[in-house]
Amino acid sequence: MINKTRTTVDQSEIDHFSRIAAEWWNPQGKFRPLHKFNPTRLAYIKEKICLAFDRDPFSLAPFAGLKILDIGCGGGLLCEPMVRLGATVIGADAAQNNIEVAKIHATQSGLSIDYRATTAEKLADKGEKFDIILNMEIVEHVADVDLFISATAKMLKPQGLMFIATLNRTWKSWGLAIVGAEYILRWLPKGTHDYKKFLKPQELKKLLLTNSLKVIDELGITYNPLNDSWNRSKDMDVNYMLLVKRLQ
């Protein structure tokens, strides 16, 4: 049972994303960067899941039979493609406004997704278990990272995979993800990120290890301004992803 006095919810973060929830599905709006790098992270997720679960990536529903949790799902930008690939998906977000937007868009798209306005710790207390857990661009927004990782670790099945995408705590990430993206290019609303919440990969790996999880792959996601594209990279100074599984 998770300590009821602790919470992963940072109310200022919830308020911030609630104010701009209607923008989730506008590719030219406030979530434009997510729309731009979504194909890159989706390709990586699909590749690794198919490899781990011995699925044919060219089949119509390679994720059939897999139960996926997208925690901090926002408007459902990852939930919808996961369902289209055949998975059973629960999308969870602490912001009710995000969940309402996600539900409406899923209905309009004819997709069945179990969206819930809840937190990782509440889901963990219910004993939920998943084949895949997506912690994408959420770690840097929670109030208690230790509790968040502990809660999500409890929900991962023995042979499951966890994907984590977040921002490194470097001067480069401060300059690009905050000064550049929020204040100069205006890609994101001011205040979207708090540099103090960024985690270095080694810090996150240590936290994962204390929860009996290990990193089996890692990569950076970098932006190319020449063709306005995001690509996989060895450069993890700003955006990076970790692929995680249980210690055997």
UniProtKB/Swiss-Prot annotation:
S-adenosyl-L-methionine binds at R41, G72, D93, M136. GO terms for biological process: methylation. Keywords: Methyltransferase, S-adenosyl-L-methionine, Transferase, Ubiquinone biosynthesis. Pathway: Cofactor biosynthesis; ubiquinone biosynthesis. Its EC number is 2.1.1.222, 2.1.1.64. It is an enzyme of class 2 (transferase). GO terms for molecular function: 2-polyprenyl-6-hydroxyphenol methylase activity; 3-demethylubiquinol 3-O-methyltransferase activity; polyprenyldihydroxybenzoate methyltransferase activity. SUPFAM superfamilies: S-adenosyl-L-methionine-dependent methyltransferases. It catalyses: a 3-demethylubiquinol + S-adenosyl-L-methionine = a ubiquinol + S-adenosyl-L-homocysteine + H(+); a 3-(all-trans-polyprenyl)benzene-1,2-diol + S-adenosyl-L-methionine = a 2-methoxy-6-(all-trans-polyprenyl)phenol + S-adenosyl-L-homocysteine + H(+). Pfam families: Methyltransf_23. NCBIfam families: UbiG. O-methyltransferase that catalyzes the 2 O-methylation steps in the ubiquinone biosynthetic pathway. Belongs to the methyltransferase superfamily. UbiG/COQ3 family. This is Ubiquinone biosynthesis O-methyltransferase. The gene is ubiG.
